[in-house]
């Protein structure tokens, strides 16, 4: 359930980003990148353009949802390590009551992932808050310090445009 709602949110978010950027930029590479970069890079872009999404109350839950989905999909890895460190409440620890080394969450793996109905509701509420908070428009500012991935894609678009002349 969580993976389904997260992936649907992700697709709708990327579509919105694509549509917004299309108002002020038309390069193929940049627009294609919107569908391939990780969400963190899109958040980085919005910070550069003035929308500080990381400071919003819902961001932590959206990010946690992303981690949960990644652990569910990929198993052990960096997302699991982040859950262990920052959000261990999503990992069931059968030895928690013993204390000591047995209760250390670093011994847990993807099979210990547990998501409750309450967690699902929190994720859903964060997504609703996100959509309600969305700026009406995202515009490019000449003074914005755009992320490297975005600038690199612009350079490729410009090179392709020059080659087609």
Q: PLM ranges: what are they?
A:
Residues 164-165:
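Short catalytic/metal-binding and nucleic-acid-binding patches
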Residues 14, 42, 123, 133, ...:
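A generic signature of intrinsically disordered, low-complexity regions enriched in glycine/proline
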